[in-house]
Amino acid sequence: MLTRLREIVEKVASAPRLNEALNILVTDICLAMDTEVCSVYLADHDRRCYYLMATRGLKKPRGRTVTLAFDEGIVGLVGRLAEPINLADAQKHPSFKYIPSVKEERFRAFLGVPIIQRRQLLGVLVVQQPELRQYD
């Protein structure tokens, strides 16, 4: 797995633009982890919200921006705690927030990992799966 992660990092680092790097990241993580969904939410500290910047497996509505406030949802909780959250059934968690536009209602398993560089939260990476399971 470490070899695969290094390969992903190298591909992401060689992408010429951020959106291409993020699309490589979510696609390759889905394949490496054998999961249906991987998404990246980037933090905007001025507006105190996360923007869904890239996803594989969720619906990203055209012409609409998907945002979560820093205090919303499990993504917000991952950011506030600055540590991973691994849930077999995210929908039962008190911080779960349903976002109808991304069509995530069938996904139960959730792993959210903060993206941190030099002690600054840059965003949250999320993987999801329909089956009830905890990621290992």
Kindly give the residue locations of the regions a language model identified.
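Short loop/turn motifs at secondary-structure junctions and domain boundaries
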Residues: S101-F107
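Signal-transmission linkers at sensory-effector interfaces
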Residues: M1-E20, L31, L122
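Helix-loop-beta substructure at the N-terminus of cytosolic sensory domains
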Residues: S14-M53, R62, E72
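A short, aliphatic-rich beta-strand micro-motif
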Residues: R108-I116
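Regulatory sensory and allosteric helical modules in signal-transduction proteins
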Residues: Y51-M53, K60-Y98
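Regulatory loop-to-helix N-cap segments in sensory/regulatory domains
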Residues: R62, Q128-D136
